[in-house]
From Swiss-Prot:
Binding site for substrate: S195
Top-level EC class as recorded in UniProt: oxidoreductase
Compartments it resides in: Mitochondrion inner membrane; Mitochondrion matrix
Gene that encodes the chain: Bdh1
Catalytic residues of the enzyme: Y208 (proton acceptor)
Native source species: Rattus norvegicus (Rat)
Protein name stated in the entry: D-beta-hydroxybutyrate dehydrogenase, mitochondrial
Length: 343
């Protein structure tokens, strides 16, 4: 039946017309999808949770705010022993103080800068000493720590590219490598927080996209290598949650923009002009003020990856517009996605 269906000409397959709208300029394009390869109504469920969380140790990086802060509290409520890695614990950050105020022996904040090898190794020792039986290992690692920026390629300094990569990519690699011995002993889980921009590129986001594409590749390689050892590796690819994570305030956007413009080579400023530059900054401000403020879909995805007997390889917590755009940009010829989304 399937072979017969696949052998039929595409024109004979029952299709569904779908109108795609580009939010940036309102342009609509009609695409024809075929159920044999695509079903827009199919939704994943997280009903296969089987592994008990009680007492299992999990380290989450980047818990000062955003996803990490919410994850630390949520996983603690589920019964995990949570080690919350915080960049600003030594500075008494408000997020750290709130986590510490729970006064639970199952939620412990630790100083952790994922760019600092010494701090990462100290975190390993802290976790190991906090385990009931270190020989049984640690159940989960959630690589959540990350930073973001914006700016077209000619507007972005090499220092910015390196800074974003050091946190998002090398921080993930560094932390994972250090904790793998404990994770292997438990046959546990690695959950890497990537982004929809780790699957599809976007203008003015190249420093971020590069690092998240790298996280995707690293996660795939690690998944292949860990499979025979019983460690499961998942990637969570959130959509636009900037409004929920407070990555960009209007003041921060303007500060970044001013620094960027001031540091541009004279030839770049002259060729592009201030009007073009300001238009791009205004577009970034609009994007940063949009998106979901409810992070529960991301929290639920990470929880499933840590607790399901058979976790998914990839999770896509995002609204329908971004999910559809990702399908178009990753499954269709580049000429089609370029026509829809490049202006």
């Amino acid at each position: 039946m399937l072979a017969a269906r696949l052998s039929r000409p595409l024109s004979q397959l029952p299709g569904k017309a779908l109108s795609v709208c580009d939010r940036e300029n309102g342009t609509r394009h009609t695409l024809l999808f075929y159920p044999a390869s695509f079903s827009p109504d199919t939704r994943r469920t997280y009903t296969s949770q089987a592994d008990a969380a009680s007492g299992k140790a999990v380290l989450v990086t980047g818990c000062d705010s955003g996803f990490g802060f919410s994850l630390a509290k949520h996983l603690h409520s589920k019964g995990f022993l949570v080690f919350a890695g915080c960049l600003l614990k030594d500075k008494g950050d408000a997020g750290v103080r709130e986590l510490d105020s729970l006064k639970s022996d199952r939620l412990r904040t630790i100083q952790l800068n994922v760019c600092n090898s010494e701090e990462v190794e100290k975190a390993v020792e802290t976790v190991r000493s906090g385990l009931k039986d270190p020989e049984k290992g640690m159940w989960g690692l959630v690589n959540n720590a990350g930073i973001s920026t914006f700016g077209e390629v000619e507007f972005t300094s090499m220092e910015t590219y390196k800074e974003v990569a050091e946190v998002n990519l090398w921080g993930t690699v560094r932390t994972t490598k250090s904790f793998l011995p404990l994770l292997r002993r438990a046959k546990g889980r690695v959950v890497n927080i990537s982004s929809m921009l780790g699957r599809m590129a976007n203008p003015a986001r190249s420093p971020y996209c590069i690092t998240k594409f790298g996280v995707e590749a690293f996660s795939d390689c690690l998944r292949y290598e860990m499979h025979p050892l019983g460690v499961k590796v998942s990637v969570v690819e959130p959509g636009n949650f900037i409004a929920a994570t407070s990555l960009y305030s209007p003041e921060r956007i303007q500060a970044i923009a001013k620094k960027m413009w001031d540091e541009l080579p004279e030839v770049v400023r002259k060729d592009y002009g201030k009007k073009y530059f300001d238009e791009k900054i205004a577009k970034m401000e609009t994007y940063c003020n949009s998106g979901s403020t409810d992070t529960s879909s991301v929290i639920n995805a990470v929880t499933h990856a840590l607790t399901a007997a058979t976790p998914y390889t990839r999770y896509h917590p995002m609204d329908y517009y971004w999910w559809l755009r990702m399908q178009v940009m990753t499954h269709f010829p580049g000429a089609i996605s370029d026509k829809i989304y490049i202006h």
